[in-house]
Amino acid sequence: LQTNGTLITEEWCALFRENNFLVGVSIDGPEDIHDAYRRNKGGGPTFGKVVEGVSLLKQERVEFNTLSTVNRLSEGRGTEVYRFMKSLGSRFMQFLPVLEHTKKGPVTGRDIIVPPGTPGASLAQWSVSAKGFGRFMNDVFDEWVLNDVGRYYVQLFDVALAQWAGVPPALCSFGEPFGEALGVEHN
């Protein structure tokens, strides 16, 4: 189950624990990184509620991992984000690059998110650059390989190492051909 963690209660935790759920919590890093783009419907910050949800999962002994999006704001802060996830108690981490495309809307002239390949679209200003994502993951790797191999798990590293050892890839982006997995998007 993947959640933003803002509505986790003791009752939800009991259901998760009794049914052996693994709960993925979406959190992008420390408060300033997380709250830059993860806002509630009213436009307010969500960091405090997410951290409360994680605390409740830990208190109620529900296994969880974290999923963090890497954007333009976080691209130079890989070590900091990784250490923050460890401080939350996350032993299994996923880091995904934000790569969204925008185009000026015909009526408002405001940027709207569009599918990649849309004529006239460009990479959104909040998207992580290729070099930025590489630097982020290199920084995470340097910290992980020096201090945490076998104690903390980063999905991208685990999949790469497994494939190197001949294990079929668990991520579609590592497979041949790329793109055999279905993705469901909100838009």
Positions of predicted regions on the chain:
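Radical SAM enzyme [4Fe-4S]-AdoMet core and its adjacent flexible, acidic
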Residues: 36-48, 55, 59-187
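A conserved non-catalytic segment of reverse transcriptases
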Residues: 23-24, 50-54
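Conserved SAM/AdoMet-binding glycine-rich loop
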Residues: 1-31
